[in-house]
A protein has these predicted regions:
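Residue-level marker for well-ordered alpha-helical positions
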Residues: 52, 75, 103, 122-125
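Alpha-helical segments flanking ligand/cofactor-binding loops in enzyme cores
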Residues: 79-82, 103, 107, 126
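Non-catalytic terminal/interface segments that mediate subunit docking, oligomerization
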Residues: 1-93
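Active-site-proximal beta-strand/loop segments in catalytic clefts of secreted hydrolases
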Residues: 93-94, 121
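Peripheral docking tails and interdomain loops at the edges
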Residues: 107-162
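Flexible loop/turn segments at secondary-structure boundaries
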Residues: 43-48, 97-100, 124-126
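C-terminal accessory domains/tails appended to large, multi-domain proteins
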Residues: 62-64, 104, 113
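Active-site-adjacent beta->alpha loops and helix N-cap segments on the catalytic face
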Residues: 74, 97-107, 146
Length: 162
């Protein structure tokens, strides 16, 4: 008879739990979790789907999403970002709105000190990258790898103090 050693037991949720544990440690140390500001562009109909996706995406990694109902002006958006205390900002809207507003919004958020992320996978990314978008989140993307990169951006160490 042929015998093989048993496969090691793994829990697929464990890497995400490590990210949330890092968030819990930050909460215990500073009184606040890491935050991402949802920079919702356009109307509620334009941004709701991607804002909901982004909220769930980041919260799976222990990053609190700061939501809103959109903004009448870019200055209003930047003021809300600064007031949020977030280091991360995620642009959320439809592809049509991104075509006309995303580059200016990304530039403004980057100038305000944000690490800029965009919810979606637009065909034309070069202009967005040049404007400061560092990460694109979308269905089918590497959620765990992206969340680890985001944690590294804001100096969270998921493996510490386990």
């Amino acid at each position: 008879a042929i015998t093989y050693p048993a496969l090691p037991s793994i829990r697929l949720a464990e890497p995400f739990e490590q990210l949330r544990d890092a968030s819990d440690r930050m909460l215990a140390k500073t009184g606040a979790r890491p935050k991402v500001f949802l920079a919702n562009l356009g109307t509620v109909a334009d941004f709701t789907a991607r804002a909901t996706f982004a909220k769930n995406f980041f919260e799976a990694g222990g990053i609190e999403a700061v939501s809103n109902d959109g903004f009448k002006s870019q200055n209003e958006m930047i003021a809300a970002f600064k007031a949020s205390g977030a280091k991360l900002a995620c642009l959320c809207s439809s592809d049509a709105v991104y075509e006309t507003r995303a580059i200016d919004a990304a530039n403004a958020l980057k100038t305000a000190g944000a690490h800029v992320i965009l919810a979606g996978r637009p065909k034309e990314q070069d202009g967005l990258k040049a404007a400061g978008v560092g990460i694109f989140i979308y269905a089918g993307g590497d959620v765990l790898g992206t969340l680890r990169s985001v944690h590294a951006m804001i100096n969270l160490n998921p493996g510490a103090e386990r």
